[in-house]
Amino acid sequence: MKFTRKLLDFYLKSSLHVALALTAMGFISLRELTSNNHYVLLPQLFFLGIVAYNFVKYIPFILKNNKSFSKKLKIIILTSCFLSCYLLFYFTSAPVKEKQILSLTILLTLAYTFPILPYKNSLRQLIGIKTVSVALCWTLISLILPIIHTEISLNLNVYAAITQRFLLVFVLILPFDIQDIKESESGNIPKKIGILNTKRLGTFILTLYTFLFYFRTFPSSIWYWANLSIVLLTAILLWLTPAKSKHQLHSTFLVESIPIVYGLWIFFFSN
């Protein structure tokens, strides 16, 4: 039991779970918008998720602490460095448009992590900007990058899909903001408008997400049911999010599992 707990802890802290969620989002995008198998892009999304989240979580800590690091952290750092080298090679060989998307994502990640002028604060301190920037990064990597990679023509359906992806990720971030309300920066949404209003905001955004179905064209009816189920599951977890969680299993594992559940549903039940 102790070994299992340590393994789960490493799985979460090394960002494997959130990277898997990002990859699942990318898989959903490719499966929905293209009839060809372009899944070669998925490993890049997975590695990018690991590197980006470990960068955000651990680089500020490393810069502030000169003490020796734990064996677990050393493994995470070394793995992230190795994957960074691979991603650098991928970046140099990527087409120009893909480089532009990746560059924008990198800039947003840096602005989110480090102070930016003239505010001398990171994006975390600006109200709501943290949530918007993370949702935008997810949308860029999990949807817009696959769209460019597969050369999908832009139309109303694609624009609606992009908007939906942004809205869904935005709401998925809110449980993290709620649980981090005491330790988070001044830009935290629940800290500004309250936990109850944050949950109401999330519900309203999910309503907008559902309304956008009117502009969508899915490969089959299973996609509608999958989307509606994910909306319902997201709403339930949002409203059940406690202001304080001892182990943070709710946000770290359950909420990040929603894209994975979504991807598995599509993998097994869609044509």
What are the functions of these language-model segments?
Residues R5, Y53-N65, A111-R124, K130, ...:
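C-terminal ends of transmembrane helices
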Residues K72-H149, L238:
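Intramembrane alpha-helical segments
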Residues A19-G26, K72-C85, I127-L145, K192-F204, ...:
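Small-residue-rich segments of transmembrane alpha-helices in multi-pass membrane proteins
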Residues T23-G26, L45-I59, C85-Y86, I106-F114, ...:
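Central hydrophobic cores of alpha-helical transmembrane segments in multi-pass inner-membrane proteins
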Residues L41-I50, K99-T109, A161-F166, W225-T234:
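Hydrophobic core segments of alpha-helical transmembrane domains in multi-pass membrane proteins
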Residues S68-K72, L228-N271:
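Extended hydrophobic alpha-helices typical of membrane-associated regions
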Residues A21-Q44, L87-Q100, L140-T163, L212-W225, ...:
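Helix-coil boundary and interhelical linker segments in multi-pass alpha-helical membrane proteins
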Residues F46-S80, F166, F170-L206:
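Solvent-exposed interhelical
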